[in-house]
């Protein structure tokens, strides 16, 4: 599979220049940008795993401390949200990128908006629940996990098994 992220992004940029009111061009460019970052991240992580000159604990620490810049992809989703404010997937995708950027409260807001627009959006409940559990709001997180499970997200039950027990926080 040939990954031509740079040329794809350039093509979306040219299309946006010709048609700046098409929200799907911004969504697609954002997706391409985030896929490129994920691909680069996987190469970085793979390189760190095979590096011989560092001990495993420092490689693990380096991997977990690295944050990639999703700001351009988020900016594209901001534009798409202005053009198509009732499309739940924009908020869900932006929530994912905000989470990857460490901006958890903003991610929760976007997942909440996605759920408001599409109350049967199980993945949004699941992701919001994960963040709430991560932020130590286990009660709210478990409520979201329960709803995600009801909506067909089976892995939510595994999370509930761990965090939904009395005394687990």
What annotation goes with each model-predicted range?
Residues 1-169:
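Alpha-helical tetratricopeptide repeat
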């Amino acid at each position: 599979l040939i990954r031509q992220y740079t040329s794809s992004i350039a093509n979306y940029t040219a299309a946006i220049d010709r048609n700046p009111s098409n929200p799907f061009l911004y969504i697609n460019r954002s997706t391409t940008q985030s896929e490129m970052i994920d691909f680069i991240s996987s190469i970085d992580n793979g390189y760190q795993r095979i590096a011989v000159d560092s001990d495993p604990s420092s490689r693990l620490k380096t991997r977990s401390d690295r944050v990639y810049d999703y700001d351009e992809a988020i900016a594209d989703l901001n534009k798409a949200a202005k053009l198509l404010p009732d499309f739940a997937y924009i908020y869900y995708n932006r929530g994912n990128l905000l989470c990857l950027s460490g901006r958890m409260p903003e991610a929760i807001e976007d997942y909440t908006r996605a759920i408001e627009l599409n109350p049967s959006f199980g993945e949004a409940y699941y992701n919001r629940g994960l963040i709430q559990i991560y932020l130590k709001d286990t009660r709210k997180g478990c409520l979201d996990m329960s709803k995600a499970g009801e909506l067909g997200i089976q892995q939510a039950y595994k999370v509930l098994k761990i965090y939904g027990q009395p005394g687990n926080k």
